[in-house]
């Protein structure tokens, strides 16, 4: 599945990461007598959780310089899509690499310049804003969720509470 836009990214991430969280939720409610509304809320919450966690992984992977680096793999993650969308010569190195105009070997010699581009571009902040929107939606769904204490609170603690403190 080729990701060319933020909308494509969000759909793909919900399908990929959201499905993992939906499966985990299913394992939790499968033996319970849940209403269709509760199951739908859990699935919506799972989709939000998938996005929250994937955006965090994408941000971290863009900044690492080992084999897991998303930039070197030309992955079209949320921060990468942001960088690809900026029409400014300052971001040409990044865009040329994704377009195949320059090699990975050349990119590796330009590590400091690329890190500067990443840090000054706003792509990290943009990703954090999108993640914050997902967190707000997750909180809204969570607040409406009918679940027994302390399990409801434990679920939040395990799945996304640590992200609520991110600036």
What role is predicted for each listed range?
Residues 1-167:
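All-alpha prenyltransferase/terpene-synthase fold signal
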